[in-house]
């Protein structure tokens, strides 16, 4: 088996005017594609690894041979992180969570606005490249951030929502205005997908 880019559930321009077409196309066809290519190269001599879902690989890095562990961490993480990212974006997104996820967010963080403020702060404070996440850890929601392409899965945490704060995710449209990009993210969040991920992780 070889790892492949997931099919985008929308066109490159579908998230306009929030996320621009050029960034989406470059992000998917160049950046994500490179992670997939490099991951396939890393595991090419290890067919037993290539049979595993990428999420399983990054969740169990200790079982990856040491000579390719760094490559799998970086490129496998990049593949897993971006695959989730595309799925939790939608041209019909925005609004607020519903159901059990809404209740869990309010229980853990206060109001939805309180949650967004805390998530935004984590995303803005990540120095350099990385991600901000809403994760399930031991049945409870947490907000965490990771460096580079590190995945919460590697720490035993299941991501429900993730935001890429690498400059390649926003610089063409937002330049150095990361907080504006973070605010815009909420307009395109696919809460139906986040709900499904939360239900599966509980």
UniProtKB/Swiss-Prot annotation:
Q: How is the cofactor bound?
A: Binds 1 Mn(2+) ion per subunit.
Q: Which residues bind Mn(2+) per the record?
A: 27, 82, 164, 168
Q: Is Metal-binding found in the keyword set?
A: yes
Q: What class of enzyme is it?
A: oxidoreductase
UniProt cofactor(s): Mn(2+)
Q: Which GO terms describe its molecular function?
A: metal ion binding; superoxide dismutase activity
Q: What are the UniProt keywords, alphabetically?
A: Manganese, Metal-binding, Oxidoreductase
* Catalyzed reactions: 2 superoxide + 2 H(+) = H2O2 + O2
Q: Which GO terms describe its cellular component?
A: cytoplasm
Q: What does this protein do?
A: Destroys superoxide anion radicals which are normally produced within the cells and which are toxic to biological systems.
Please describe the quaternary structure of this protein. Homodimer.
Q: Which family does it belong to?
A: Belongs to the iron/manganese superoxide dismutase family.
Annotated protein name in UniProt: Superoxide dismutase [Mn]
The species is Listeria innocua serovar 6a (strain ATCC BAA-680 / CLIP 11262)
